Amino acid sequence: MFQDNPLLAQLKQQLHSQTPRAEGVVKATEKGFGFLEVDAQKSYFIPPPQMKKVMHGDRIIAVIHSEKERESAEPEELVEPFLTRFVGKVQGKNDRLAIVPDHPLLKDAIPCRAARGLNHEFKEGDWAVAEMRRHPLKGDRSFYAELTQYITFGDDHFVPWWVTLARHNLEKEAPDGVATEMLDEGLVRKDLTALDFVTIDSASTEDMDDALFAKALPDDKLQLIVAIADPTAWIAEGSKLDKAAKIRAFTNYLPGFNIPMLPRELSDDLCSLRANEVRPVLACRMTLSADGTIEDNIEFFAATIESKAKLVYDQVSDWLENTGDWQPESEAIAEQVRLLAQICQRRGEWRHNHALVFKDRPDYRFILGEKGEVLDIVAEPRRIANRIVEEAMIAANICAARVLRDKLGFGIYNVHMGFDPANADALAALLKTHGLHVDAEEVLTLDGFCKLRRELDAQPTGFLDSRIRRFQSFAEISTEPGPHFGLGLEAYATWTSPIRKYGDMINHRLLKAVIKGETATRPQDEITVQMAERRRLNRMAERDVGDWLYARFLKDKAGTDTRFAAEIVDISRGGMRVRLVDNGAIAFIPAPFLHAVRDELVCSQENGTVQIKGETVYKVTDVIDVTIAEVRMETRSIIARPVA
């Protein structure tokens, strides 16, 4: 009799609309209960039975119940699931399979089965890609997943690489395809094979994409020709190889190996500027005045060159610093190295005075054995030879940015707008508390930004610099010319790595149109979105593989007295993140390791400090000694403890 009662339906509707609800993200804990985080200030308790309906990270709408002054959340509706496609480890075998997601806060096994057409018999320990098919908040009885891809077996030494690439849905190998002959581009190539071009790279580099030639001119001027490998001489726009490169957008450099953007035949051979091999190039000739200014007579042209020597960073640096036993093979090569060092000196000074120079940070290199085991991790400081190449590339990219801007009005530009205007007042207020006075309007201009950066670089520590990083905007890829505040430049467009960056290939095609005096089509904005997304995924993949290898490397140091110098990189409510100076590993120091009495301890992310009893004991950028307390292999996390 109540079935179609309109009054009852109305009452139900009323009760539903009057019941308080909240939307937020589920945060799981190790203890079985969880929280619904609505915003930074507000969260609701989710009891263990209700947590069975949801997963950490799910965005949900929940009914809020109040009992005896205590509020709790009952999940009602799924807004966005945390898990859709994921990687994990298979449990069980044959017809009763489950998968445990590879995530620090997801511990429960999810029942699953292999997708139709997936011809692999899964067994305990296998790694797989899965997709969620059922969720309790969608009216299903339980969670359920489908295995869509077999990654590898549990004991594979190369699990860190294969699992990471599968997680981010990135390619595992070089693209297929061959380039049989050069295209007829209607370009006249200058024959520069007689000039003493050299390449400077790591000893193991195969994909050499830049060669340099320097010459002294009257009036204390120097000429530099930067010759860049020319893959667009082989790859037609819109061809199969071009489309594959467009999707990959970059060569993916992971510890131990890379996955190239172009077929290896091109990247490591046909396009690589190998010593004593004739190669087509796109070149830029520039004149530098005595103070390092790039004069206006910039010239881009197509050419053929023959590199006369493959030089190695450390050997060149040693020779210029009068150490080591390496010698250039001829006086002509020695003269090139001396002139290039002079150019580097001039350009470095010019950028220091008129733009911005990044602080040198070492690169960390993993030395791996046959089975992917980490034999060592070495810090490679940036030396004079690295800076020679860096200054030449930056100068060449400044030239391209100018030419594309003035001749076409578009290109693929790296743009960085400095500080977000919305943060300008907060930034000025923060700096004022540290005795630095800046004008909130001026700091949004390129000159104002550079002025502030120079003042920060002159500070005795990097503490203040670390405090203002959160006010900065992110660098972007744009088809419009625009300033790059981070480099202190009016415009910056890269074209010097076309073997490994698709954006540089686009700029090559545009520069060739300028050389031929032809009109060119503006690149579509979608390509910049794809490039930015791929750059983000590649960086995450590099970090994930690195975390895995660091955990492997430091595992036997856990619980020992081995000390490591560590720089504090971040402070949060839960503790501090530090970077080990010798090898670059990131470790976490939980708050209880800093001080036993929680009420006397204040860890402030806002101030970048740790205070004990009101006294600042640690701050971001401090270097402290730590030992490794624990390495958790399943989450690839390293827990450290300060040395008392």
UniProtKB/Swiss-Prot annotation:
It is found in: Cytoplasm. Residues 561-643 form the S1 motif domain. Coiled coil: none annotated. It comes from the Bacteria. One of its GO terms (molecular function) is exoribonuclease II activity. Keywords: Cytoplasm, Exonuclease, Hydrolase, Nuclease, RNA-binding. Its EC number is 3.1.13.1. Residues 189-516 form the RNB domain. InterPro entries: CSD (IPR011129), NA-bd_OB-fold (IPR012340), RNase_B_OB_dom (IPR013223), RNase_II (IPR011804), RNase_II/R (IPR001900), RNase_II/R_CS (IPR022966), RNase_II/RNase_R (IPR004476), RNR_Ribonuclease (IPR050180). It catalyses: Exonucleolytic cleavage in the 3'- to 5'-direction to yield nucleoside 5'-phosphates. One of its GO terms (biological process) is mRNA catabolic process. Belongs to the RNR ribonuclease family. RNase II subfamily. This is Exoribonuclease 2. It comes from Escherichia coli O157:H7.
